[in-house]
Amino acid sequence: MDRSEIVARENPVITQRVTNLLRTNAPLLFMPIDIHEVRYGAYMLFMYGSLENGYKAEVRIENIPVFFDVQIESDNTNQLFLKSLLAAENITYERLETLTQRPVMGYREKEKEFAPYIRIFFKSLYERRKAITYLNNMGYNTAADDTTCYYRMVSRELKLPLTSWIQLQHYSYEPRGLVHRFSVTPEDLVSYQDDGPTDHSIVMAYDIETYSPVKGTVPDPNQANDVVFMICMRIFWIHSTEPLASTCITMAPCKKSPEWTTIVCSSEKNLLLSFAEQFSRWAPDICTGFNDSRYDWPFIVEKSMQHDILEEVFNKMSLFWPQKLDTILKCYYVKEKRVKISAEKSIISSFLHTPGCLPMDVRNMCMQLYPKAEKTSLKAFLENCGLDSKVDLPYHLMWKYYETRDSEKMADVAYYCIIDAQRCQDLLVRHNVIPDRREVGILSYTSLYDCIYYAGGHKVCNMLIAYAIHDEYGRIACSTIARGKREHGKYPGAFVIDPVKGLEQDKPTTGLDFASLYPSLIMAYNFSPEKFVASRDEANSLMAKGESLHYVSFHFNNRLVEGWFVRHNNVPDKMGLYPKVLIDLLNKRTALKQELKKLGEKKECIHESHPGFKELQFRHAMVDAKQKALKIFMNTFYGEAGNNLSPFFLLPLAGGVTSSGQYNLKLVYNFVINKGYGIKYGDTDSLYITCPDSLYTEVTDAYLNSQKTIKHYEQLCHEKVLLSMKAMSTLCAEVNEYLRQDNGTSYLRMAYEEVLFPVCFTGKKKYYGIAHVNTPNFNTKELFIRGIDIIKQGQTKLTKTIGTRIMEESMKLRRPEDHRPPLIEIVKTVLKDAVVNMKQWNFEDFIQTDAWRPDKDNKAVQIFMSRMHARREQLKKHGAAATSQFAEPEPGERFSYVIVEKQVQFDIQGHRTDTTRKGDKMEYVSEAKAKNLPIDILFYINNYVLGLCARFINENEEFQPPGNVSNKDEYAQRRAKSYLQKFVQSIHPKDKSVIKQGIVHRQCYKYVHQEIKKKIGIFADLYKEFFNNTTNPIESFIQSTQFMIHYFDEEQKVNHSMKKMVEQHAALAGNPAGNALMRAIFTQLIVEEKKIVQALYNKGDEIHDLLTYIINNINYKIATFQTKQMLTFELSSTHVELLLKLNKTWLILVGIHVAKKHLHVLLGLSNNEPPSKTFIQQAIEEECGSIKPSCYDFIS
């Protein structure tokens, strides 16, 4: 069944009416979905979408004028000069038209308000672009100069939204297969102002299943043996979750189902061609899948390339004329499209954009809606929305069914795949995604593609130009090209009053907030680029003529920036572009919110079974989508005004808005203080205020004269909240009147939403309390929390639970007569319970998430991924079939892990040798569960919990810094955390044991080290005695070497080569020509040094007399030390042996190093005179003094 048959079956009445309209060439309603331009030759714009009954339609718009504007001087000679410039560059144009417009930058008085422009018309976009580039390089100001997407300019100029109903008039009509083709001119298109009929555009949701013979790996399209073996597709009306038709295309036999049509293909090539064929039969307007832009589309395209059928597949799916392969890959296969998820995060998408169908990845949409979501799987998003889950079918079972070709089991795979596709549409409808994006497109004159794949800034910019170019907004000429030097720096910071930290249990605190501060400032002070005055002389001249100006000044990059904005004084004609647009958006949103409230009240009165409920629900969703779109634009407005890459950017305006915000918050602050109110905290657009004590005198006295029971105290708190609400309502009205008198408008207003009591401020933008909105409510389970990191992305349940316990305990109402534990006591009590009673925690309490970003220097994640890579390689080397449990996530994808405990190890000096790096302790959740690995609870406490707990107590006097510390909050936080670390160490039994063990290691090593130094001194004195005989230094060297060998190996010679070398030394002692041979011997000594050391080290047990004495002495010292201290930890025999070997080895190395140094001296002499005694003694002392025994360096 194709699209036309489905439409006729589902909408017979509307289809008959549309057929009649087509027969008589009467006006038709058309809903555009996808936009394509013909940019070569004569410009044409193709819009694809549906007629009101659901027929697929293509609207070709011809005879669209191609032009841009350039500002010139007033006399005609400049026009002639412009013509000559274009002719000199061989730029062909059709004609020139003169018009007047208002430049967007800089204030112009009424008589000079408009400037002359020339509109240059072209036959093609190529010549237009060439002219824009040339004239911009020549220094001319241009307008209407879009160079990337000309259709946006067409939409603005015609006031023709690209995402709402359009009426087609005077069209040429040609039916061709499933597509109804229309040809029109711009004059034949009329924007339909009413809401229009129900949209019957078609969405195709699909999913693919892939297979790899290498078990445990993710199928890779670049691997020849990895295949796509199933594609399931389901189509819907755009607003519905009821399927219109379903198809399953498979390479394995599959039992037929009444729920879908089954197509069995003999090969992957045929499967892909069948997919394209079915796609063309349904001709969907939107194609959607879950994560399909990162997996499904790349897989389909790559496999089509391998089978050499991509051109055929594309041309079957496309409604455009046939394209060659190179054109498809260049123009229609979007390989890397960066989609913005949040301010900090973007994601790369890849998809095949066939003309007539808009691709949309549901996962990207959901991530934009939930930018802080811990999990981004289909199952997780369905759970968040309360929707039915997907089918549970593990991949290894699916692959087994495919391998066995069991038709019954393959039907289960098909059902799994079909339901995945169904859930994509469920999510789109639940979140009203497409209507929301459409409303954004209507406001900004952009396409649905723009609304999905571009950030908000360019849409705000496009909307501003659409407002500006029309007469009612002043006919302002706007460029889309950013000009001038783009400086980077910080604008004036917000006005901040440091919080009075700590727990407030006696007086309610109320937040007073500016409503939409930055948009309100723009409206109040007429901040707009065409109202800006740059020079003081011009400002003085305007003020002399009676104009009212708002002065702004601030420091930016070490210089003073100043300017003036001509104020509107509530006269509509004097309002700038920015205020006019914001006021229009505000008025529209206010009206929609009122309508939404009425619709909501109606919904509550009508049961779901009522015939009109669905229509009411649809209307409610549409109105809500419109008001949300308006809110988005109002909130994004200042962001674009302050964006230095925007063509509208003006530094004095961007900084002027923030500095005016500072001024007004200070103004309100002083007003409130003078009224006798207290300030607990203030920041950017809000103040947290306490009422005067006198307000509560009467109710407090009543309590003091009562029996002071807990019920009486609760009544007191209840009355305090009510009194605060009443007082703040009065104060708010007084503040707004004061602001109106100051700025002369009513746009800048403050409001209060809740009273907080009790409340606790822990830092800037960090506080919590019990919120009382309309009536008092002392429920500690519903806390008002701002900035406290218990809900931070990646945070564990452990941290959230401990933080919540502390806050809930601190919010309990306690009478002044009772013991009110300070916050530090509450924190320690909760911490002690968390550390001592470990059994209360489950495995899930420790699960964390992080994002894998290969290009980001997140050391812990980088170390962990490096370990997982090494583990996978090791498994492959040993022939393991499955390594997927250690697979690397996709870049940007979040993964779950836990921190596991590693065995505590020390070196002989008492330094811990086990790793403390987070990356070495991380393990995937599945691996930790499978192997029952112990969780390192202390790591979580120290690294995640204590920082949060320190935030609660850092206001204590003992943590406060001295007066000369600049960042006092950071200092206090660090001290508080250190205090809590010591507290945890004192109550954690394992931590105390580890510390004790380390102390024993360190102190034992200290004793041995001292003994070694003594014996080295004795041994060095022996060498000094031998070297004192300076009459024959070579003979002294030989004697000292022979002594060393004799002393350490009386029974056996060290080795033959060393014996031979010593004999050669003795034979050549009196030969003045022996230097050359001595150099050879020295070289041999370097080669043999390791052998000598190793031989002596291996014979350590046979060293007698002096070394025996040393060994016995050290053993005695260690034993005495341990007995004295009576420590529970015992030094193992292995440690003692290492200590003793360390002692032996260093005695040997001293001798060798001294010998080497003196050979250097002897070889460096130019004659046979021996070195002086002083020089030799100094050298020995230096050599012995530089030796620092290190067990780790030697043993490793």
Curated annotation (Swiss-Prot):
SMART domains for the chain: POLBc (SM00486)
Q: Does the keyword Transferase apply?
A: yes
Database matches in InterPro entries: DNA-dir_DNA_pol_B (IPR006172), DNA-dir_DNA_pol_B_CS (IPR017964), DNA-dir_DNA_pol_B_exonuc (IPR006133), DNA-dir_DNA_pol_B_multi_dom (IPR006134), DNA/RNA_pol_sf (IPR043502), DNA_pol_B_thumb (IPR042087), DNA_pol_palm_dom_sf (IPR023211), DNA_pol_type-B (IPR050240)
Expression induction per the record is: Expressed in the early phase of the viral replicative cycle.
Q: Which PROSITE patterns match?
A: DNA_POLYMERASE_B
Catalytic activity of the protein: DNA(n) + a 2'-deoxyribonucleoside 5'-triphosphate = DNA(n+1) + diphosphate
User: Which keywords accompany this UniProt record?
Assistant: DNA replication, DNA-binding, DNA-directed DNA polymerase, Nucleotidyltransferase, Transferase, Viral DNA replication
Keyword set includes DNA-binding:
yes
The GO annotation for biological process reads: DNA-templated DNA replication; viral DNA genome replication
| Pfam families, sorted | DNA_pol_B, DNA_pol_B_exo1
EC id: 2.7.7.7
Q: Which GO terms describe its molecular function?
A: DNA binding; DNA-directed DNA polymerase activity; nucleotide binding
Which cysteine pairs are joined by S-S bonds?
A: none
Q: What else is known?
A: Consistent with its intracellular location, ASFV encodes its own replicative DNA polymerase and three base excision repair enzymes: a class II AP endonuclease, the repair polymerase Pol X, and an ATP-dependent DNA ligase.
Q: Record's family?
A: Belongs to the DNA polymerase type-B family.
Per the entry, what this protein does is:
DNA-directed DNA polymerase involved in viral DNA replication.
**What is this protein's record name?**
DNA polymerase beta
